[in-house]
């Protein structure tokens, strides 16, 4: 039996939070003794406390993927003899979580072609590092911090929420997309890296109000405004400004766009996957990309920037027709008060015309995308299932 682990992670519906929950579940199911310490954000830092789940978090309500959350918390609530510490969070928090005379393991991710300069010393505090993609492994290796880097992908969801035909029809009416023959959708926060303005401009350029298409944008309540200060503003206002500018530039009424700038439960997010015909993202880069991963797991075609960690599950251009052409560009400093992104880094940028062309091509002939999506979903079902990835995770944490 492996020795025990003290496991630090967020209990929240973020990429870090959901990926860590799946990893924690895999460790428990593999018989590894684990005590879970839940991280809570506190300004620029975090606090940590042993899990004590007195009620289901709001984001987990009715979510089939989190039905076992109470049981998972109960299985990891008590102290265990441990010789390893796993911190599933950004490296800035590792120093306060790692323990002397223990094997300290950091699980993290990055999205550009170079790591933040201040990460070098933080990464050196770990005994090993776990990242979710080959793209990340290359970036971390280039940093030459002298710490072993292991690639363990995020796990395929073990359950999704079902949505019957009547529920799908009702949701389409509520979202105003009941007349659309093709529904594009995206699930991304409103921040510079996700580049939602390019997607909105491309959609307005690609289609008219008469076209039977729609775009559903699930985003955050607040977003970041224009550089260099990136003021926090309501995402609805930011999106409307982009759409208004695009409409003026095109000189015609826009196609149907529905903005959802609020938090949603896992069940609500899965409902978008169920009614959407194609997931689309003009992101500048992803370490893995859980939104696209879930869409691909369900067999939805993905149209997305062709650079980043998502290539591990979407594949190369020959097998994935949804790869959007890109060029590598300099990254603006962000966030302005304490940047981790710097101009010495590069990420991928897609052009409005190229995205618009890809959207029109999908509507004209979606079958190549659907066939590829079926193959990708089959690969994910086989290669990213818990028994497969769980074994890789245990090996990364325990093979000395």
Go through the PLM ranges and name each one.
Residues 5, 177-194, 200-203, 215-217:
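Conserved donor-binding/catalytic core segment of Leloir-type glycosyltransferases
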Residues 161-177:
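A short helix/loop element that forms part of the nucleotide-sugar donor recognition site in Leloir-type
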Residues 47-143:
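Extended catalytic core of nucleotide-activated donor transferases of GT-like folds
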Residues 301-304, 314, 319-325:
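Short hydrophobic beta-strand element within catalytic cores of glycosyltransferases
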Residues 1-82:
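N-terminal pre-catalytic "stem/leader" segment of glycosyltransferase-like enzymes
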Residues 346-355, 363-395:
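A charged, aromatic-enriched C-terminal amphipathic alpha-helix characteristic of glycosyltransferases
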């Amino acid at each position: 039996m492996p020795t025990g682990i003290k496991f630090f992670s967020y209990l929240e519906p973020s990429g870090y939070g959901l990926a860590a929950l799946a990893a924690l579940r895999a460790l428990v199911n593999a018989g590894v003794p684990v005590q879970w310490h839940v991280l809570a954000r506190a300004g620029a830092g975090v606090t940590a406390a042993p899990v004590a789940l007195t009620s289901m978090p709001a984001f987990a309500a009715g979510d089939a993927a989190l039905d076992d959350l109470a049981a998972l918390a109960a299985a990891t609530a008590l102290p265990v003899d441990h010789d390893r510490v796993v911190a599933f969070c950004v490296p800035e928090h590792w120093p306060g979580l790692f323990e002397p005379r223990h094997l300290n393991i950091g699980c993290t991710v990055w999205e550009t072609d170079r790591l933040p300069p201040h990460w070098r010393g933080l990464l050196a505090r770990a005994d090993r590092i776990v990242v979710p993609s080959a793209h990340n492994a290359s970036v971390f290796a280039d940093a030459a911090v002298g710490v072993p880097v292991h690639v363990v992908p995020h796990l395929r969801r073990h359950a999704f929420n079902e949505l019957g035909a009547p529920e799908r029809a009702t949701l389409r009416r509520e979202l105003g997309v009941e007349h659309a023959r093709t529904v594009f959708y995206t699930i991304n926060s409103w921040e510079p890296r996700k580049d939602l303005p390019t997607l909105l401009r491309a959609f307005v350029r690609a289609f008219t109000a008469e076209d039977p298409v729609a775009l559903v944008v699930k985003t955050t309540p607040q977003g970041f405004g224009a550089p260099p200060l990136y003021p926090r503003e309501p995402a609805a206002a930011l999106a409307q400004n982009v759409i208004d500018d695009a409409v003026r530039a095109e000189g015609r009424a826009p196609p149907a766009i529905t903005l959802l700038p609020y938090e949603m439960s896992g069940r609500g997010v899965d409902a978008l996957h169920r009614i959407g015909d194609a997931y689309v993202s003009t992101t500048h880069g992803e370490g893995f990309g859980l939104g696209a991963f879930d869409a691909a797991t369900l067999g939805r075609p993905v149209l997305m920037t062709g650079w980043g960690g998502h290539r591990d599950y979407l594949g190369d251009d020959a097998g994935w027709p949804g790869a959007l052409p890109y060029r590598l560009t300099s990254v603006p400093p962000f966030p302005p008060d304490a940047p981790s992104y710097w101009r010495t880094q590069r990420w991928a940028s897609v052009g409005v015309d190229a995205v618009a062309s890809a959207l029109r091509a999908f509507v004209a002939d979606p079958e190549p995308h659907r066939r590829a999506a079926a193959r990708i979903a089959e690969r994910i079902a086989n290669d990213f299932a818990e028994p497969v990835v769980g074994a890789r995770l245990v090996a990364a944490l325990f093979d000395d």
